[in-house]
Structures are given as structure tokens and as C-alpha cells.
Amino acid sequence: MDLNKQILSRRPIIIALIAILVVLIGGGGFWVYRLAWAPNFKPDKTVYVYIDDKKDFDDLCRQLRDSANCLRIGSFKQLSGLLKYPASMRTGRYAVKPGMSNLTLLNDLRRGHQVAARVTFNNVRFKEDLAERISDQLMFGKENLLCLLNDSVYCDSLGFTPETIHALFIPNTYEIYWNISADKFIRRMKREYDAFWTPERLKKAEEIGLTPVEASILASIVEEETAASDEYPIVAGLYINRLHAGIPLQADPTVKFAVGDFSLQRILFEHLEIDSPYNTYKHAGLPPGPLRIPTIKGLNSVLNHTKHKYLYMCAKEDFSGRHNFAVTLAEHNRNANRYRAELNRRRIR
């Protein structure tokens, strides 16, 4: 009886202790949930954080605050410490999605589960432009890429020279991991180049009498020559006619390249006298390398050029960017005289 009385007397204390324990467990569970699984990032849309060799954990936290609308940066830091993440940061481009939790993001960061970047390049003329365009989209620096593109031994290992390396790059959109090295990026482009040059395309180039690199060089001239893409196959056919006939190309864009000024509106005799292997008024055949990185459309226009007898072309006097084509020199001279007259009328020197 006394024992029952003792138990009954202590019952409120036991209930209180159990209640406290439940509260503690519940509170601990809520704390763990809030720390690990509760949504902690609420950007308006998926954003990306970037970690390179120079960034530390504090830099990452700043990105999460500024770009990913982190609600509780302290909890992210706390869980990162518990998981020893700051000591094992991996470079890369990581997605932060609306409603993401600390643990989900940290699992991606710790395992290096990054999201590939969509790398695009087009309308690129010089290697310096290419290096800048690509380095703006990937982790490596402009100089890292330029160093390889200008290295004759490296280019030779890929079947190119520093003058022809432009031809390696086929303009398109590629999914590439942001932290790729410059060397691996170039080798990825080499695989894309090899995939582009199918047996069918190789056969077409061979039938014309061109290697893939020579086809790229010619395509670059074609694209610089006309602003009207529907003229590409006609212009390509014209230059192929001249190559087969042993006639110098006499392509104005090659002179502009030799001069180093693509803004020239009028090619003068002094420009034609520049002694450069790119000056196709002085040197027969194709120049040593592409004037720009040709597009797929430009390359295909060479491989599928229009068959005709044109040997001459001159910009139209309406300055539309289109051309008058001619079979004979006499016809060409008439076209050229009309164009020169319009240049004079507009006082373009």
C-alpha cells in the first residue's frame, strides 16, 4: 500500500519528465529537420554557384546569400562544418534550385555533382576572340587557351598548325563541365570536329580537291566575302572554279586580313601590294589558314557549292551586301565600274 502511494505521489514528476523528454526529442528533431532538410534556398529560378581554385568557403557563402536567396546561412555553415565540407570543396558549376535544402545542396557539392554549362561560340574571327569568348563561359583563363592554340607542337599533335587551328572549332552549342581544363576542352572540340567530318563530307571535299582544313579556309573566305548567306554556295563555286583553273583567288577579305583591318570599305592598290601569304592577289591558292571560324552553313556551302562558270564577282552598287557575278572579265569590269562610281558618289575613299 505504501509502495502504491509512493508511485502515485511521484506520478506528476514522472509525467513531467516524460513531457520534458518528448519536448526535447521533438525540439531536437525539429532542429535537425531545420538544419538539414528544411527548404533554405529560395531563388526565383534555378541559379548556379561557381567554385574555382581561388574560391574558399566564405566566397561560396557569399554567392549563396547574394544569388540563391539563402534564408539561414548560419544553418548552412553549421551543417557544412558537421559534414567537414569546407575541407573537401570541389571546383565546378552547381545548381541551386528553389526550395532546396542544405543537405541536398551539400550532397551535390561534396560529390562534385555539377551541372554542365551550355557553351556557344559563333561569329568568331581571331584566336584571341575565341579564347575570350570561351573563357567567359568556362573556368580556365583566356591565356591558358591561347597558349595551347599558339603552340606549334601542341597543334601538330592534333593535325593542325597555329595558323589552321581555327578549323578545329565547329560553331555550335555544347554541354561542357565548367571546370574542364583548356587541354581537355580542345580535345573535346577535336572529337566534335571528327564527328562533323563524316565519310560523306570527307568524300565531297576530296572530290573538290580539298582537305577538311582547306575546306574550312575556303568557307571562311566565303563568309567574309558576302553578308547574304544564300550567296554562299555561289561564291564557293566561283572560288573553286578559280582554284581549278589556277587563277589567283583575288579575294578582298584576304587583303583585309593581311592589312589587319576588316572595316576597309575600299581596297586600294596600296593594299594589294602588301606582301603577306594571306594576300591572294599576290599569292595563288588558298591562304595559310582560315580568316575566321566558319559556320556549319559556310562549310556545307563549300561541300555543296553551286556549279556554274562564274570567275568574277563584284559588290552590288546598291550596297545591299550582295554581288554581281560574271563569267568574263569584260562583264566583270562593267560591274566594277558601276560599283566604283557609286563609291565615288558616296565619297567613300
Feature locations, PLM:
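Intrinsic structural disorder
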Residues: 1-16, 46, 53, 62-68, ...
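N-terminal type II signal-anchor transmembrane helix
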Residues: 2-46
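Polar/charged alpha-helical tracts
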Residues: 5, 9-15, 33-35, 62, ...
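N-terminal start-of-chain detector that recognizes signal peptides
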Residues: 19-24, 66-68, 91-93, 144-149, ...
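Pocket-edge positions in alpha/beta enzyme catalytic cores
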Residues: 21, 49-52, 97, 207, ...
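Signal peptide-directed extracytoplasmic domains
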Residues: 30-197
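Bacterial extracytoplasmic/cell-wall-associated proteins, especially those involved in peptidoglycan
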Residues: 120, 138-143, 147, 154-349
